[in-house]
């Protein structure tokens, strides 16, 4: 990093929420705001932090204990209960509990401010250098319409938030509307597995910032890490594109480690992650049994998650259906020949699925085999023929989408 003094004071505004995931198991008190505090502390230990958040008694106790040993000032707007999010898996839409019926007002000011949209509060931010992430695909709130003031404003949004906030659909129109309405000098639109686009003016065509591949993917909170690291790097005088590149590597390190650990800054500096550069939109063949209700539900979940990541998916269950072998098999084989890669549900060692895997391997296709319960011996042929064997569902989905785009 370069430029200004890195031991500055940063004000962070954002939620502190309970996050519970059933598979893989995750039960932590985090949320965007508190995660940002932890990220700043891990990456930039000399920075003083002022933290504005809201929550119940558990949040107050957490911050009291943490502040006793760290450079942290905090202010908690008290709520009856801390908001909780429950995920079936990291790619699923969470169920939310504890959100108050009315929003509270929160004010925060400072020379350098990282602000996250909050479910329970409208935040009015006043700062010289401000990074704002609305954090709400359903109802993103405008920085300026909340009364926010900033001499230098950067917006970080995903595609859905950018379209909702701007009222436009095409990215060129989105960009123009947000620069004009929000009076920002930098706009970052996160595009999932395709990376992010960084704009520095409404006439800018945008610079693509790649996603970096990790061997394990735990995405809950990765967007918070990206925004926070980008903010500090930008505050330090880095160009927006350079700051976003560092932030993308930091997000990959977080996904790899499944949390904020001491060695994340070293991982980012070592630059051990490969860029994912989408070159095409290849077809994913979804192989798996669909004889019982639970099998049909899981095949549908896999299809939905892959499509949600932007993949084109052929599913024999959804696209051909059940029928006589002479009717369905030729159609399946045709798509196996045409696909870029295969996502295979291997638990249960279904004979049809194993045939599809073997056929794909013989054709030189990439195969990601998602399996939780089978023995190493049962998977020997898959392992020996170069299939990616994954026990983590989210990682399997990400790897499949990466292969499909190569």
What is the predicted function of each stretch?
Residues 3-12, 16-27, 37-129, 272-278:
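Conserved N-terminal subdomain of the carbohydrate kinase-like
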Residues 74-78, 385-400:
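Short acidic-hydrophobic, aromatic-tinged amphipathic segments that line or gate anion-handling sites
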Residues 3-8, 173-281:
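Conserved phosphate-binding/catalytic region of the ribokinase-like
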Residues 65-80, 252-308, 316-321:
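Charged C-terminal helix
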Residues 348-369:
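Amphipathic helical hotspot of TIR/SEFIR-family domains
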Residues 321-344, 352-356:
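TIR-domain catalytic/interaction hotspot
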Residues 134-206:
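Conserved phosphate/ATP/ADP-binding segment of small-molecule kinases
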């Amino acid at each position: 990093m370069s430029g200004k003094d890195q031991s500055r004071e940063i004000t962070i505004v954002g939620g502190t929420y309970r996050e519970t995931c059933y598979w893989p198991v995750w039960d932590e008190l985090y949320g965007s705001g508190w995660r940002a505090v932890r990220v700043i502390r891990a990456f930039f230990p000399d920075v003083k932090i002022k933290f504005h958040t809201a929550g119940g008694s558990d949040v107050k106790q957490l911050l009291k204990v943490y502040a006793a040993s760290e450079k942290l000032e905090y202010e908690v707007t008290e709520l009856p209960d801390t908001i909780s999010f429950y995920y079936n898996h990291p790619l699923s839409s969470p169920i939310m509990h504890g959100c108050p019926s009315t929003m509270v007002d929160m004010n925060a000011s400072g020379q350098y401010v990282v602000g996250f949209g909050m479910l329970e509060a409208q935040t009015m931010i006043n700062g010289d250098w401000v990074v704002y992430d609305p954090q709400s695909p359903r109802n993103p709130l405008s920085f300026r319409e909340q009364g926010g003031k900033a001499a230098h404003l950067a917006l970080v949004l995903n595609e859905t938030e950018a379209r909702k906030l701007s009222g436009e659909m095409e990215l060129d129109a989105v960009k123009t509307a947000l620069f004009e309405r929000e009076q920002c000098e930098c706009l970052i639109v996160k595009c999932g597995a395709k990376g992010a686009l960084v704009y520095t003016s409404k006439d800018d065509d945008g610079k693509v910032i790649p996603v970096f591949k990790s061997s394990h993917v735990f995405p809950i909170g990765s967007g918070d890490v990206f925004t926070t690291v980008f903010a500090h790097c930008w505050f330090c005088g880095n160009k927006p594109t350079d700051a976003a590149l560092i932030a993308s590597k930091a997000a990959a390190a977080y996904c790899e480690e499944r949390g904020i650990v001491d060695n994340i800054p070293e991982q980012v500096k070592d630059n051990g992650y490969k860029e994912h550069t989408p070159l095409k939109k290849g077809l994913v063949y979804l192989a798996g049994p669909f004889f019982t209700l639970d099998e049909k539900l899981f095949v549908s979940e896999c299809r939905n998650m892959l499509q949600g990541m932007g993949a084109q998916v052929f599913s024999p269950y959804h696209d051909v259906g059940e029928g006589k072998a002479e009717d369905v098999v030729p159609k399946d084989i045709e798509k196996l020949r045409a696909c870029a890669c295969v996502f295979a549900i291997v638990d249960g060692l279904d004979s049809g699925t194993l045939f599809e895997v073997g056929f794909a391997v013989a054709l030189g296709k990439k195969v990601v085999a998602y399996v939780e319960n089978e023995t190493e011996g049962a998977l020997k042929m898959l392992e020996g023929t170069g299939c990616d064997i994954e026990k983590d569902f989210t990682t399997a989905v990400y790897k499949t989408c990466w292969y499909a785009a190569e």
